[in-house]
């Protein structure tokens, strides 16, 4: 009997060691209670993943049968991005414990909200970002750029939607997908149209000939769940693969929130699939190392500057920032044939995406090498960039 107890104790200890980790703190204000992101081990095959999802779905159903309906819907989305497997859902603690003890699971994290990284400032302010990124020295409004201007490159705006009929897109914009339940295929907030036009607009944008795809992953108030955004990323990779434009695509994420490991992995896998990913550093005037997607590997993280080449007071900073770009008082398109002025690292990121698209078109630079090229040709220095932060300022290599 004593030996049996020892064996049981050892087995329990081994099970505890092998159990997956639950990473997030449930006390965070942005965390969604009882909603989880479940990430599988790298060794799990697609078939094993499908089988596991079926198991988890059945497990939740059994829990509901025992406990009755409790408002938890169980399985939500599965994700397959460049060999990476994960899923999301809302589960009772009993079901969560079973998932954590499954040997195919690497870790589990709470689903949480993420937010746009821009805000409206003033109306009728002059636009200056185009001229700034096409000259090494400040002081001119002329925009000098390669005539191809992103031709043959596709820009995915993962945001609040895009007004694809806005004249600034010149008929180059199409609707892609909407992963936000209960919202229409439009941009009521305006943030997504503004960022997309900053990158690709005929008048206000950098890559004036790029194709534009609207991907709605944030609600009409500028907030979104990572479980939805990850589904949008999966869709973009699948769409780019289907259209044979891997290596000729840019994806912009002008969002910021607390660090989420599962989200970072999804973003990194998107980049490694062959899509250049520009992201916002965030607007908290703090180190972006603890922010997602800013801290994801393989992305080009942009912080924001003022018209005087200073770090914008709101901009995050830190070692994960790859480059600075114009982000304060940026004029661009907004829904219903309008224009507006916004500030934020949300505006800096599409400057990076737009210049990235122009260089991909003109020089054929691979997405994986593009951020390094932007850093190599960058101008500067940015004044007071922040602790452990680059002072490089985005430049399109025009020779001016």
From Swiss-Prot:
Residues 1-19 form the signal peptide. The keyword Nucleotide-binding does not apply. The keyword Glycoprotein applies. It comes from the Eukaryota. One of its GO terms (molecular function) is serine-type endopeptidase activity. It is found in: Secreted. Coiled coil: none annotated. Glycans are attached at residues 138, 181, 252, 336-337, 396. Residues 381-393 have a biased composition (Polar residues). Belongs to the peptidase S8 family. This is Subtilisin-like protease 11. It comes from Arthroderma otae (strain ATCC MYA-4605 / CBS 113480) (Microsporum canis). The gene is SUB11.
């Amino acid at each position: 009997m004593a030996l049996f107890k020892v064996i049981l104790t050892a087995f329990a200890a081994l099970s505890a060691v092998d159990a997956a980790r639950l990473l997030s703190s449930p006390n965070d204000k942005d965390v969604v209670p009882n909603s989880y992101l479940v990430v599988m081990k790298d060794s799990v095959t697609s078939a094993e993943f499908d089988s596991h999802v079926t198991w988890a779905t059945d497990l939740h159903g059994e829990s509901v049968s025992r406990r009755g309906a409790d408002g938890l819907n169980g399985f939500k989305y599965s994700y397959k991005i460049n060999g990476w497997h994960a899923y999301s859902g809302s589960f009772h603690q009993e079901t969560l414990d079973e998932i954590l003890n499954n040997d195919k699971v690497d870790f589990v994290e709470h689903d949480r909200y993420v937010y746009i990284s821009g805000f409206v400032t003033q109306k009728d302010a002059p636009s200056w970002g185009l001229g700034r990124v096409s000259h090494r020295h400040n002081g001119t409004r002329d925009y000098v750029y390669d005539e191809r201007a992103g031709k043959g490159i596709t820009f995915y705006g993962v945001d609040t939607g895009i007004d694809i009929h806005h004249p600034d897109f010149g008929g180059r914009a199409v609707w892609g997908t909407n992963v936000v339940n209960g919202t229409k295929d439009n941009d009521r907030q305006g943030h997504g149209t503004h960022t997309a036009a900053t990158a690709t607009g005929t008048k206000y944008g950098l890559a004036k000939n790029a194709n534009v795809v609207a991907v709605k992953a944030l609600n009409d108030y500028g907030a979104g769940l990572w479980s939805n955004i990850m589904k949008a990323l999966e869709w973009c990779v699948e769409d780019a693969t289907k259209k044979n434009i891997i290596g000729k695509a840019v994806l912009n994420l002008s969002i910021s929130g607390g660090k989420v490991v599962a989200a970072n992995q999804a973003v990194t896998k998107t980049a490694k699939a062959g899509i250049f990913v520009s992201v916002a550093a965030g607007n908290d005037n703090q180190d972006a190392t603890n922010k997602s997607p800013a801290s994801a590997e393989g992305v080009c993280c942009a912080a924001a500057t003022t018209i005087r080449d200073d770090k914008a007071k709101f901009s995050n900073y830190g070692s994960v920032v790859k480059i600075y770009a114009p982000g304060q008082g940026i004029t661009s398109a907004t829904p219903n044939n309008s224009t507006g002025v916004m500030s934020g690292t949300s505006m800096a990121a599409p400057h990076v995406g737009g210049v990235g698209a122009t260089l991909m078109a003109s020089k054929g630079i691979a997405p994986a090498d593009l951020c390094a090229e932007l850093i190599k040709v960058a101008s500067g220095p940015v004044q007071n960039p922040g602790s452990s932060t680059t002072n490089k300022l985005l430049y399109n290599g025009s020779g001016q």
